[in-house]
Amino acid sequence: SSAASDVYKRQIVLLVVLFPANIFAQERRDKEQTYVLENPYEVNKITPLQGKKIKNVVLMIGDGMSLMHVYSAWTANRGKLFLDNCQAVGLSKTYCANKLITDSGAGGTAIATGQKTNYHSVGVDVEGRPLKSLVDFAVGKDKSAGIAVTCRLWDATPADFCCHNKDRDAEAEIVADYVNSNVDYVFGGGAKLFENREDGRDLFKELRDKGFQTPRSWDELVKIKSGKVFAGPYPV
């Protein structure tokens, strides 16, 4: 019948469309998918000093890094990583107060303050109230505290330790909080939001007025041996 013929034609067309995909999928399965690090780097084993009080604590955050990322690197480097020398490792449950999937704002706030907060929030609780971070607790115990990042300073992860805002996208507002934070040393990018601002503020000048040195290049930074430092050499 005509109807049966139409169905048959549709089936033929469907097979023509799908069959090549099955072939390609088989080719992908048959092809070996491997990565080989030809020159793995050496990892020195560091033995912790026994009986001595720890002076410095470094918190390393691989933003978005999961156990699988670490395991992949460990496997590629023949079962050795400098991370193996870390004496303490922590895990964060990656959900925020109002969403199942977090972002760097809420996720970083949990690490920095020990409290869950809303999606996109930076250093504030679910009501928008500022939270004390590890930086504040360190200074409260007469310790110095600093942050050094490979991103812009208004990015949520570094901002979680020094700034307070309900919206991580309020970048100009966020960087202004560094002026009144308790941090002693800062290194990161994003200098363009510290000067030539729409509100007319020069945040580098305000930081200098508070006793910070504000080197704008790597050469200037390495010459500084003491004192409070706010280094923003990268304008991006």
What are these regions (language model features)?
Residues 9-26:
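Bacterial Sec-dependent N-terminal signal peptides
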